[in-house]
Amino acid sequence: MIGYFLYFQFVKSDEFINSPYNSLQDLFSKNVVRGEIQTKDGHVIARTKVSSDASETREYPDGRMFAHVAGFAVNGKAGLEKQENFSLLRSHEFFLDQIVNDISGKKNTGDNVVTTLDYEAQAAAYNALDDYEGAVIAIEPKTGKIAVMVSKPDYDPNTIASDWESVNGEGSTSLYNRATQGQYAPGSVFKIFTALEYYNENPSTYNDYSFDCDGSITKDGFTIHCAGNKSHGQEDLTKSFAKSCNSSFSNIGLLVDNNKLNTLCDDMLFNKNLPIAFDSKKSKFALDNNASSALTMQTTIGQGNTLVSPLHMCMIAGAICNDGNLMRPYLVDHTENASGALVEQNKPASYKQIMSKDQAAFLQNLMAAVVSDGTGAKLSNQSYEAFGKTGTAQVSDSTDQTNAWFVGYGKKDGYNDLTIAVIVEDSGAGSTYAVPVAKKVFDKYFNE
């Protein structure tokens, strides 16, 4: 048995053990009590209770709040229970203790997985979404550490086995992690990319941009309206962005080169797998110079056929905050044995420079104006400085339902910066529904 234990301890790979189809997991679990999953601040979000008769029950003390990120350890596993299965089933108890346990027939204690999650910020996000479906994800842009990952609707991982048919049945989306796998029309948060392309094509004259908004714009018989048909009057690029003027950005969309915008979006990780260990889906974008005026106008204000995930938009906000450098997002800070001794430490790693420092500074200024003079004003005058872009995305042409977006970041001396993406489904304007969610997370994270 000791030889078997050493073989799996030091030879077999993470991928081999983590596979939910690996029958040897059953043998492994007969010798190890599955370790804990913890937040960065020591809250246990998954643990194994061992009864007096030696039976084991996997418990999730916070229930639904960490459902999608912690996952579950039955029915094929999900979340961190799946991703970190090898670590949780591996024991780094002191070697002599393992030998004594083996001789006495006692199980060893598995290693603990300590995440990057911030317990209080996670709770703030979960409660702020209330009964709405949607997602919140927040990341430290200078490290890539994921501080918050919330998705609704959710499920109770404590009763997942008995609830399996209902949560996994036809029509149910409770198991779906909207934060990483959700694909949504971006609405006006896409104006980040449209504005950047205009800047790229007009590096010395973008400040000269001017548009007189009367509430709508028509081209080739197709009309785009501003929200509520509101007239924004004379605007430069900054005001157009801050007020989220659809008419002005449709005009900008007609001015930029669609092929170049398509290349920009490819550089910004559209149509690509995101660099994260968690299951995620690609964002989708396609537009070229053969597109009609109608499709161009729709696409450059975030409608059309474009789809994005909250994770992707949070990463883009992170690169903007971090002067163009995108860090790899990650959820596990380190693993430790049952006594708290370090086993393995994960470290921040840069993915790539996806925009120049000057490009990032341009977008930083636009996102600051959204808070100081635009649709993100509820985030102004705080102890922290906030930057962002709101969005209100039409769900389909046949309904008035809209999803609310906020994408941005916060900064405060003495704290790590925090980027955030919020999507509130079937709600209303981003300024009304998504910004307050972001504010509650920022308030808690920055101790407002």
Residue ranges and their predicted role:
Residues 1-164, 174, 183, 209, ...:
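Periplasmic/cell-envelope proteins involved in peptidoglycan metabolism and beta-lactam response
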Residues 41, 101, 142-188, 193-427:
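Beta-lactam-recognizing serine transpeptidase/beta-lactamase-like catalytic domain environment
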